[in-house]
């Protein structure tokens, strides 16, 4: 479903609406079972919700749509039982979750590899070649949202310009694994910088230095006790721990 300007935003709004309802459904089911297990919840999210959010990511995956990530954050904050305005930096760090942009971008790069091997008689290959010839190297405002330009920009950003120049790599599986790790490392560094640059997080960073899921999320099985610790660590309780 595209708009008259060939935008995916209308379709994404529909997908994200369904995905958010699925998150609520998962939460209700787990409440009925009287459990809110960390591993189970996010396995269900990754298996049932994430595929809905990343539908057709091969095409739009290199564009960071906030509406997609908002559902991911909605699920994370509902699990932690914190307010919607809780800083996203704390949410990602506490759960050790990475933005879905990493997965969507990899889908686009994976599709780019597939396009390189298609014969020119195939319509997807013809569309790609036309887009590439018209836009790559002609980075005016009108061309910056081109799909091929986005692919090239991704390779350049993460230090793999040679892959674009060579129109591929020898071992695609190994490269995608390497690219994913590079994206993860860059995000970890960005997360750390945000944590250290803000006075608002001075208390949180005194006991949070590694980007990984906190052990108490699985060790504390009584939800009400876990929720108290979550709110205390994030400074969203009655005690003003950030001053």
Predicted regions: what they are:
Residues 113-117, 122, 126-133, 147-157, ...:
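Nuclease-adjacent, charged terminal/linker segments that flank catalytic cores
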Residues 1-131:
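Non-catalytic, peripheral interaction segments enriched in hydrophobic/basic residues
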Residues 96, 137-141, 147-151:
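Long, internal protein-protein interaction and assembly surfaces
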Residues 153-243:
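Helix/loop segments that flank and initiate small ligand/metal-binding modules
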Residues 84, 142-147, 221:
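Residue-level preference for nonpolar/small residues embedded in alpha-helices
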């Amino acid at each position: 479903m595209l708009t008259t300007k060939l935008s995916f935003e209308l379709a994404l709004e529909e997908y994200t609406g369904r995905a958010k309802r699925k998150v609520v459904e998962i939460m209700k089911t787990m409440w009925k079972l009287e459990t809110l297990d960390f591993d189970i919840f996010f396995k269900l999210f990754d298996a049932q919700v994430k595929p809905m959010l990343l539908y057709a990511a091969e095409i739009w995956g290199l564009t960071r749509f906030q509406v997609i990530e908002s559902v991911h954050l909605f699920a994370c904050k509902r699990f932690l039982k914190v307010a919607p305005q809780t800083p996203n930096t704390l949410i990602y760090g506490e759960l050790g979750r990475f933005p879905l942009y990493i997965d969507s971008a990899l889908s686009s790069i994976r599709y780019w590899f597939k396009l390189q091997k298609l014969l020119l008689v195939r319509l997807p290959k013809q569309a790609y070649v036309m887009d590439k010839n018209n836009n790559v190297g002609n980075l005016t405002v009108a061309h910056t949202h081109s799909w091929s330009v986005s692919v090239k920009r991704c390779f350049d950003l993460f230090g793999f310009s040679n892959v674009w120049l060579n129109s591929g790599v020898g071992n695609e599986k190994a490269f995608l694994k390497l690219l994913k790790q590079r994206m993860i490392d860059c995000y970890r560094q960005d997360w750390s910088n945000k944590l250290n640059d803000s006075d608002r997080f001075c208390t949180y960073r005194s006991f949070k230095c590694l980007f990984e899921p906190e052990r108490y999320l699985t060790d504390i099985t009584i939800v009400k006790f876990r929720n108290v610790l979550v709110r205390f660590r994030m400074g969203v309780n009655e005690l003003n721990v950030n001053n």
